Amino acid sequence: MAPAMEEIRQAQRAEGPAAVLAIGTSTPPNALYQADYPDYYFRITKSEHLTELKEKFKRMCDKSMIKKRYMYLTEEILKENPNICAFMAPSLDARQDIVVTEVPKLAKEAAVRAIKEWGHPKSRITHLIFCTTSGIDMPGADYQLTRLLGLRPSVNRFMLYQQGCFAGGTVLRLAKDLAENNAGARVLVVCSEITAVTFRGPSESHLDSLVGQALFGDGAAAIIVGSDPDSATERPLFQLVSASQTILPESEGAIDGHLREIGLTFHLLKDVPGLISKNIQKCLLDAFKPLGVHDWNSIFWIAHPGGPAILDQVEIKLGLKAEKLAASRSVLAEYGNMSSACVLFILDEMRRRSAEAGQATTGEGLEWGVLFGFGPGLTVETIVLRSVPIAGAE
């Protein structure tokens, strides 16, 4: 009996490691340029009389290293919903009405692109992981996306709500476990974020809220994850070698988010960049010890760009060369902080710029890489990646 059970269990598992097989991204069409945003933001929220606060906000935007962001909320929508523009006005119903529809729709655009690149029928998708910090509903966004895409009713769904900015790592960790423990599994992973839950007017007494208004943008990213790829029809982009999560010491309350009648509020209560840079070396040592890697400039980097200060302090603390965080900085500049979707956008940017530069691998010509998610807790997700050779590269 026991040997038969062991054979069954072995047959249920994949032979090789999980790999990212395709990536797709999407944004709303409404682009907002950071240089113009302070004037727009204070006008649309009827806050132009707060001249000193507007100057502070301009400085925040100037230091953000963001060029543009995309937002579903247009001027027309905001004019129709004045409570969303006010500071701390009851507005959850209006916000929910937007996100329960628009979060799955934006997710669909990214998923369609990922499925197209993968090149297989969507009926082969066995699992769906959906992640958002933008609203909550039942049945969830995972159900809505299943219907929008026409996935099989028997697809195994997982819905992650309210995880925050580390969750791009969380979904990879979960997808890795699903792909490696279910032979033949093909996991569709989607992160979709819309700032309609967090947008609000300024207040002189809550500058941490203003920081979020300068940083956050909308976006959705989708990937297909599977083990034992078909060499004839599937092209792996990155292998998921290991995945771990940890809570940083003495970081309780560093980032808090609370869903209330006024929407989702974020509070930055401690030196977040300092806490991350102080602890990141240990995360790296724990993750790369089995591989014998100790030179952090010898690996490629995908780090959640919560803000420029996080990237700057990590770079200084580890003595990283400027180009190491180039892909992360590029996504921050072009899209802002899209919470859980950010690191998947950076994965896409990494493979794209590696190919365009004629690099030998999807990881800037290097073999090993790291993906970091940082968020409430403070929680850190650490994913060790292995790149794959780029066809035709010298």
Curated annotation (Swiss-Prot):
Pathway in which the depicted protein is active: Secondary metabolite biosynthesis; flavonoid biosynthesis
The entry's keywords: Acyltransferase, Flavonoid biosynthesis, Transferase
Q: Which Gene3D superfamilies match?
A: 3.40.47.10
**Reaction equation(s) it catalyzes:** (E)-4-coumaroyl-CoA + 3 malonyl-CoA + 3 H(+) = 2',4,4',6'-tetrahydroxychalcone + 3 CO2 + 4 CoA
Write out the GO MF terms.
Answer: naringenin-chalcone synthase activity
Pfam assignment, any one:
Chal_sti_synt_C
Coiled-coil portions: none
Which residue positions are annotated as catalytic?
A: 165
Q: Which gene encodes it?
A: CHS4
GO terms classed as biological process:
flavonoid biosynthetic process; polyketide biosynthetic process
* Official protein name in the record: Chalcone synthase 4
